């Protein structure tokens, strides 16, 4: 909101909104997180139309599997028990992409003019799974996550 008027006046700029691969797929036990990330994606897609012809672009970034402390910081409580422990173990297996690699992917995507940038371990797989098999991917996710 603060920078958009200036970008519109200059007829150039790029708004980069960070969503998540969970902005494409509804992941088990992540409902609140999914809502926020689908929302970021929806806002960005709305901006594609609203900014058309203005010289200003909007990009949604969908990282996943980035090796940060998000899984540890996002733990809810010990009372969540077995489900929490299972998700923590899954996170250890999937959070493999270094943050610097993710940042490089984002910069490259912005420079290419991409509207969506999908980066990180298994993120492209989940993205295409949700697009090509929208009625089947939830079952596949359940099988993969145990």
List where the protein language model places each region.
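A short helix-coil junction within the Rossmann-fold of NAD(P)-dependent oxidoreductases
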Residues: 2-11
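Alpha-helical segment proximal to the catalytic Tyr-Lys
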Residues: 5-6, 49-53
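SDR active-site lid
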Residues: 53-121
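Catalytic tyrosine of NAD(P)H-dependent dehydrogenase/reductases that use a Tyr as the general acid/base
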Residues: 33, 41
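Active-site helix of classical SDR
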Residues: 36
């Amino acid at each position: 909101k603060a920078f958009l008027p200036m970008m519109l006046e200059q007829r150039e700029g790029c708004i980069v909104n960070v969503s998540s691969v969970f902005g494409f797929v509804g992941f088990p036990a992540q409902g609140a997180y999914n809502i926020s990330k689908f929302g970021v994606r929806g806002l960005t897609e709305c901006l594609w139309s609203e900014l058309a012809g203005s010289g200003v672009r909007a990009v949604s970034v969908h990282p996943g599997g980035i090796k940060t402390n998000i899984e540890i910081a996002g733990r809810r409580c010990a009372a969540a028990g077995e489900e929490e422990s299972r998700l923590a173990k899954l996170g250890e297996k999937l959070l493999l992409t270094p943050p610097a690699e993710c940042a490089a992917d984002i910069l490259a995507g912005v420079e290419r003019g991409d509207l969506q940038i999908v980066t990180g371990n298994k993120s492209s797989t989940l993205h295409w799974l949700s697009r090509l098999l929208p009625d089947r991917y939830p079952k596949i996710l359940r099988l993969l996550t145990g």
